[in-house]
């Protein structure tokens, strides 16, 4: 999809102009530093899916190639653990706090 170009000045103006939380839908191609800066510039909620599912798919491929096991519970657990790791990482990057 190419390199993301983020207009932080525009984001600042939007945040200043409207009294509602701002949501980022998708983050393909963004780095941890990009996410941190987006939060600093007013993003309140971040939706991401692709990175999580790609990590899960890669983990399942690696598991199947290494073990030759294709039982559903093994595949689901491998997928779950990989996706959980991505979500946990992003929660830390986003600076998410419990409510």
Language-model segments: residues:
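Short, electropositive alpha-helical surface patch
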Residues: 9-15, 39-47
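Glycine-rich phosphate-binding active-site loops on the catalytic face of alpha/beta enzymes
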Residues: 41-59
């Amino acid at each position: 999809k190419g390199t993301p170009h983020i207009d932080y000045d525009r984001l600042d103006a939007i945040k200043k102009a409207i009294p509602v939380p701002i949501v980022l839908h998708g983050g393909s191609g963004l780095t941890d530093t990009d996410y941190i800066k987006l939060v600093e510039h007013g993003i309140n909620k971040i939706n991401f899916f692709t990175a999580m599912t790609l990590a899960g798919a890669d983990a399942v491929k690696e598991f199947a190639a290494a073990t030759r096991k294709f039982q559903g519970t093994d595949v689901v657990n491998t997928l779950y653990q990989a996706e959980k790791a991505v979500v946990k990482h992003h929660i830390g990057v986003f600076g998410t706090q419990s409510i």
